[in-house]
Amino acid sequence: MPKWAALFMVGAAWLSAADPAGMVLIPGGEYFRGRAFPWSDYEVAWYPNPVKDDSPARKITVDAFWLDAAEVTNLRYAAFVKSEGHRAPYHWRSGQMSAGKGSHPANNVSWDDAVAFCAWDGAKRLPTEAEWEKAARGDQEGKMYPWGDRDITAKDAVFNQIDGPQAVCSKGKVGGLCDVTGNVWEWCSDWYGQKYYASAAPVNPSGPETGQYRVLRGGSWFDVPPLFLTIPYRSWARPGERSPTIGLRCAKSAAR
């Protein structure tokens, strides 16, 4: 096959047609990042003094990239632990994942653990916060959820649970992606900045240069109020935090 035949056009960029296994191509382009809808009485009742760090909503541009279709599973993470001798999540007894949990998302994973896994898994990386929101929004500009503004239900996402996460992709896909909302929070590469949106670069923003916390997006199985599960909601944790509600999903820059 001639070299040109292995290329295709997405936006203004020529990209390799080789599809990384288990990943979805997120087209590059502009979108409005941040909260573009008002706070409801229900949300204020749950969260009376919101930080409102998801504003102002601004138009930004990101390049095309690949994103894992699903959150990293215990099975994938176990292969990494075995291959690299990396520490296992602390809840794995004797360093072994629980039986029957291979298809569940890996959790109790720190930011550094997540970075190391993604590098091992085909020279990937964590998505930037801007990339994560671009993927989560799809064509739902200014909406609350990946499917629009309809209220979230148990058919849409894994949330309001007490027994931990569920198998990935058990709630279906939106735009080829599973569990963008709920199941486990997902680490992003950025440092967290409460007022960062007002000064962020308009093209490929990658977060503040320094900070104490790394960004988390998407909500988890434990979260009750829909507030934490909306697309623009931002959370954070110290890089060394290992929590039952935190997992990961990897990204990869699209070859030009």
Predicted region positions:
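Short, compositionally biased
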Residues: 2-87, 111-112, 138, 238, ...
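Functional-site microenvironments in short loops/helix caps that host divalent-cation chemistry
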Residues: 25-26, 32, 37-49, 87-235, ...
